[in-house]
UniProtKB/Swiss-Prot annotation:
Residues 1-19 form the signal peptide. GO terms for cellular component: extracellular region. This is ELH type 2. It holds the Pfam family ELH. Bag cell neurons. It comes from Aplysia parvula (Dwarf sea hare). It is found in: Secreted. It comes from the Eukaryota. One of its GO terms (molecular function) is hormone activity. InterPro entries: ELH.
């Protein structure tokens, strides 16, 4: 009996929950759980749809309000945005001085291979030549110059658009070559200066040795002559003998 009573109570609760309907202005459609099986009504008690189909969120009163002020504000905002886009599309023509190209709807839609639609949803025409990315083009004379900078890795047309751009930390081959040549030139200059200095030192040493040899020879000649004179004249004084002894000692 107790189990039968419990089954009846559960069946009554399930029936009441399935037939329950939410009313009132205090109910917020945004707060409803998407998996809820209840029917969601608008504040005006108009049927919107099942929340399981996400229609209550798409057609909530906050987005579809029947108030005239909100509708006028939304319309003004849409028109302002539309005028801004039209002015943005007309700006490149006024700056560049190009005449507006008039294209019919049929001719614009006839290009099936086009990657972009020529007309947007607001009616502004998409102009491919004005919206294309700006590329730097150079004359054929500069391209065919044959210089090292015009190689494939140094092509000025593709250098700015390449993924691997050369930075200041990775210099080019030409700059490395120039720096290496300048370094070699500095080394050679330093070697030349060192050789010149060594040569001057050797020359000075040779001149000094030659001067000392000449001085020694003159002193020897003078000593010999003085010794011969001393032997010839034996009556010289003691001072001259001491002088001769000192000279002989110096020569030795």
């Amino acid at each position: 009996a107790i189990s039968l009573l419990m089954c009846l109570i559960l069946s009554a609760l399930c029936a009441s929950s399935e037939s329950a309907v939410v009313h009132g202005d205090d109910f917020a459609a945004e707060r409803a759980v998407k998996s809820s099986p209840y029917l969601v009504l608008s504040p005006a008690d108009e049927m919107v749809g099942m929340s399981t189909a996400n229609e209550a969120f798409d057609k909530s009163p906050s987005y579809y309000d029947d108030d005239d002020d909100d509708f006028v504000n939304n319309e003004k905002r849409r028109l302002r945005f539309h005028k801004r886009r039209i002015r943005f599309h007309k700006r490149p023509q006024e700056v560049s001085g190009l005449k507006p190209v008039m294209m019919s709807r049929a001719s614009a839609s006839a290009d099936e291979n086009s990657l972009f639609d020529l007309y947007n949803t607001d009616g502004a025409m998409y102009q491919r030549e004005l919206r294309a990315p700006r590329l730097r083009f150079y004359s054929l004379r500069k391209r065919a110059a044959g210089d090292e900078d015009k190689a494939e890795e140094h092509n000025p047309e593709t250098e700015s658009h390449s993924r691997r751009k050369r930075s200041a930390l990775t210099p080019s081959i030409r700059s490395l070559r120039s720096s290496l040549e300048s370094g070699i030139a500095k080394i050679s200059i330093n070697q030349d200066l060192k050789a010149i200095a060594d040569m001057l030192i050797v020359e000075q040493k040779q001149e000094r040795e030659k001067y000392l040899a000449d001085l020694r020879q003159r002193l020897l000649n003078k000593g010999k002559r003085s010794s011969e004179v001393a032997l010839a004249a034996s009556d010289k004084g003691d001072e001259e003998r001491e002088l001769l002894n000192t000279l002989s000692n110096l020569l030795e």
